[in-house]
Amino acid sequence: MQDPNADTEWNDILRKKGILPPKESLKELEEEAEEEQRILQQSVVKTYEDMTLEELDDHEDEFNEEDERAIEMYRRQRLAEWKVTKLKNKFGEVLEISGKDYVQEVTKAGEGLWVILHLYKQGIPLCALINQHLSGLARKFPDVKFIKAISTTCIPNYPDRNLPTIFVYLEGDIKAQFIGPLVFGGMNLTRDELEWKLSESGAIMTDLEENPKKPIEDVLLSSVRRSALMKRDSDSEGD
């Protein structure tokens, strides 16, 4: 049987008579092929956009050089995104250290890195409360390094009366220190209050709009006002 797509004089006559359909031009065929390749390329890229770095490595032998260039672009993009995510979520928890780790974890922590160190001891309720608050703050501010250590492992003979103690460092230098229970306000300390206190040192960027703990002056003034109102009401009832 004769090929209807062959370039023969007989086929040309049949096309003129309408017996055979018109033959597509070479240009049209090339355009169709390019369009098919473009669609295929898009589907390949779209598929690889959804893949992990490991999956990209597993399938790297399945495509030609042009495909590999597109895939390499997405691989680099995904790697950059992964590094940014990794950096933002560098910590996220309170690390336990001892004195031998101090230089590495604090002094050599890294350029531009804030470190918050809590010196504590087991059996001191306020220390336990602050450790609990710091765990929440570490999750909220994963770019800040929160660490804790039993006081005497870092500073021999450090007095218990100074506990809890928090030191705030930037590139190994102390930027703030909070020593003793009075500084923290005792067991009434809330996580927001601790967050605000640490934010004043510059270590964290709080989203709190104002100090959650009212200054002592405001508390005293409110107490005086309440006493005055109660006295006035009492005098009115006596009349």
Swiss-Prot record:
**What SUPFAM superfamilies does the entry give?**
Thioredoxin-like
Q: Which domain of life is it from?
A: Eukaryota
Positions of modified residues (N-acetylmethionine) = 1
Report the Pfam families cross-referenced here.
Phosducin
* Keyword annotations: Acetylation, Angiogenesis, Apoptosis, Chaperone, Cytoplasm, Endoplasmic reticulum, Host-virus interaction, Phosphoprotein
* Disulfide-bonded cysteines: none
Annotated segments matching region Thioredoxin fold = 91-239
- Give the chief site where it resides: cytoplasm
Q: What family does this belong to?
A: Belongs to the phosducin family.
The protein's job, in short, is:
Acts as a chaperone for the angiogenic VEGF receptor KDR/VEGFR2, increasing its abundance by inhibiting its ubiquitination and degradation. Inhibits the folding activity of the chaperonin-containing T-complex (CCT) which leads to inhibition of cytoskeletal actin folding. Acts as a chaperone during heat shock alongside HSP90 and HSP40/70 chaperone complexes. Modulates the activation of caspases during apoptosis.
Q: Provide the protein name.
A: Phosducin-like protein 3
